[in-house]
Amino acid sequence: MKIGIIGAMEPEVAILREQISNMETLSIAGCEFYRGELAGHDVILTRSGIGKVAASIATTILLDRYAPDCVINTGSAGGFDPELRVGDVVISDEVRHHDVNVTAFGYEPGQLPQQPAAFISDSKLIEVATQVMHQLPELQSRIGLICTGDQFMCDPDHIEQVRQTFPAMMAAEMEAAAIAQVCHQFKVPFVVIRSLSDIAGTESPSTFEEYLEVAAKNSSAMIVAMLKQL
């Protein structure tokens, strides 16, 4: 199986890259592509850069050049669900933009024209992630809504506004909805696996810096375990 894996930052891809054998590296438009074998699969690990535009560029190149059978987005996120803690893993059942608003024209909050309100994760990939959840009980994992915006969520007023608009939201980050939208348009299955580096709030910047490596380790462990099941 040919699998694309996308992470935004170096710490989010480094652990996985170390485990790839027979690796070839390609740089295009500021994106890094590492192709080789991981857990018996042909894997293209992609470092996209931060934010929705960077993620869209990287995902488009990945899908057009390598044509993977599915895409997994890895990395860190900020927690929104009060039951979640730093280091916990959130698996997307759907992904939405939280910083899009064209409701004046009858669209749902977060919905772009000519796009669905939510991008639905692949049921088979969710099923595999669910199996892995039981195999890795040391990782606290939940399945739910992940929302994306070109914003680091640390302003309390803004956090409350987003929470009211998307009450089911478990985690926020800066790339997943863009990746999901490109996958939707290419008709490629996807899922998002994110570990929490912080809980959205005023302490988020310092917590993020402290726990990014923990989040990267946990999300990478989940993905390697998933690859072994696919």
Swiss-Prot record:
EC number(s) reported in the record: 3.2.2.9
GO BP terms in the entry: L-methionine salvage from methylthioadenosine; L-methionine salvage from S-adenosylmethionine; nucleoside catabolic process
Entry coiled-coil feature ranges: none
Pfam families xref list: PNP_UDP_1
GO CC term (a single one): cytosol
Pathway field: Amino-acid biosynthesis; L-methionine biosynthesis via salvage pathway; S-methyl-5-thio-alpha-D-ribose 1-phosphate from S-methyl-5'-thioadenosine (hydrolase route): step 1/2
Binding-site list for substrate: 78, 153, 174-175
Source superkingdom: Bacteria
Residues of the active site: 12 (proton acceptor), 198 (proton donor)
GO molecular function: adenosylhomocysteine nucleosidase activity; methylthioadenosine nucleosidase activity
Catalytic function, reaction form: S-adenosyl-L-homocysteine + H2O = S-(5-deoxy-D-ribos-5-yl)-L-homocysteine + adenine; S-methyl-5'-thioadenosine + H2O = 5-(methylsulfanyl)-D-ribose + adenine; 5'-deoxyadenosine + H2O = 5-deoxy-D-ribose + adenine
Record keywords: Amino-acid biosynthesis, Hydrolase, Methionine biosynthesis
Enzyme type, top EC level: hydrolase
Alphabetical list of HAMAP family matching this protein: Salvage_MtnN (MF_01684)
Family statement drawn from the similarity comment of this UniProt entry: Belongs to the PNP/UDP phosphorylase family. MtnN subfamily.
Function comment: Catalyzes the irreversible cleavage of the glycosidic bond in both 5'-methylthioadenosine (MTA) and S-adenosylhomocysteine (SAH/AdoHcy) to adenine and the corresponding thioribose, 5'-methylthioribose and S-ribosylhomocysteine, respectively. Also cleaves 5'-deoxyadenosine, a toxic by-product of radical S-adenosylmethionine (SAM) enzymes, into 5-deoxyribose and adenine.
The protein's name in its UniProt record: 5'-methylthioadenosine/S-adenosylhomocysteine nucleosidase
Organism, scientific name: Tolumonas auensis (strain DSM 9187 / NBRC 110442 / TA 4)
